[in-house]
Regions:
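N-terminal Rossmann NAD(P)H-binding glycine-rich loop of SDR-like oxidoreductase domains
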Residues: 5-24
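Mid/C-terminal beta-alpha module of Rossmann-like enzyme folds, strongest
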Residues: 195, 202-247, 251
Length: 282
């Protein structure tokens, strides 16, 4: 039996946890997971030594600085983790011939397009977070020849996320306000993890969009959460300019899984179905 050596960087994040959980039941994988305490991905020598020592077949880079508003005031940290660390990992993977997965975001787009974004659409990030992830994409393409860049959006799983925030607010408030002029596709880490694990068994390298099917506003998302959990709470729809935050968000974050569909690999469920399953298990 061939054993695949796989590294999950950022194993304690939502997606990293899901990938590790799914693979823990597979006897064809030898998995090592690292967090920022185990491996400083911003230190090239440390990354290089670690990857060369273990000679991984696949490296999944889930490590990121995802606090979108804090990125605006911590620009150096954002680029260090989201861009230059991605470069370190890509350089080391290329030395060993490892396949590399880089998780990217809908924030690389400006949200001004009418209709969903395809992988081939021009990127134009509005925020520091989006710009740092866009540069991470560039470095990944530049220094790795076996890369899968997967852009996703509105992710939820085992950790802090919009779903947990809404459920938490419902315990202390009778009425909340939620943005209703930004659209996107709520995406389960379970669906995304399965997509990644299918991709790494191929050599169909390139950029992919990976989100659940369908789209909604944050307001619609919140209402569906409360509906599925039978929670009685008033939800007020508001515009983005009424919700004060440091980073500009794209109004249209809908990604079309075009490349997955071309490769017959789009196994994402409708966002409502994935959400219902998630809520049944938390």
């Amino acid at each position: 039996m061939i054993i695949i050596k796989l590294l999950v960087i950022g194993c304690d994040g939502q997606l990293g946890k899901e990938i590790t959980k799914i693979l823990s039941g597979e006897n064809t994988y030898e998995i090592i997971g690292t967090n920022k305490k185990d491996l400083d991905i911003c230190n090239f020598k440390e990354v290089d030594d670690f990857i060369l020592k273990h000679k991984f077949d696949v490296v999944i880079n889930c490590g990121a600085y995802t606090k979108v508003d804090l990125c605006e005031s911590n620009k150096e940290k954002a680029f260090l983790i989201n861009s230059f660390a991605a470069k370190n990992i890509a350089l080391s993977c290329e030395k060993t011939g490892a396949k590399l997965v880089y998780i990217s975001t809908d924030y690389v787009f400006d949200g001004k397009k009418e209709g969903p974004y395809y992988e081939s659409d021009k990127i134009n990030p509005l925020s520091i977070y989006g710009k740092s992830k866009a540069l991470g994409e560039i470095y990944t393409k530049m220094f790795s020849s076996k890369y899968f860049i997967i852009r996703t959006a509105w992710l939820y799983g085992d950790g802090n996320n919009f779903v947990k925030t809404m459920l938490g607010l419902s315990k202390t408030k009778d009425c909340i306000s939620v943005v209703n002029d930004q659209i996107g596709s709520p995406t389960s880490t379970k669906d995304l993890a399965n997509c990644i694990l299918n991709l790494i068994n191929t050599e169909n390298y390139g950029i992919y969009h990976g989100t659940c099917n369908g789209f909604c506003t944050w307001y619609d998302f919140a209402c569906k959460i409360f509906e599925l959990k039978n929670i009685n709470i008033k939800v007020n729809p508001i515009n983005s300019n009424e919700y004060k935050c440091d980073a500009i968000r794209p109004l249209n974050s809908v990604l079309y899984n075009h490349m997955l569909k071309i490769n017959n690999m789009d196994n994402f469920r409708d966002w409502q179905d994935s959400l219902e399953e998630y809520l049944e298990n938390i």
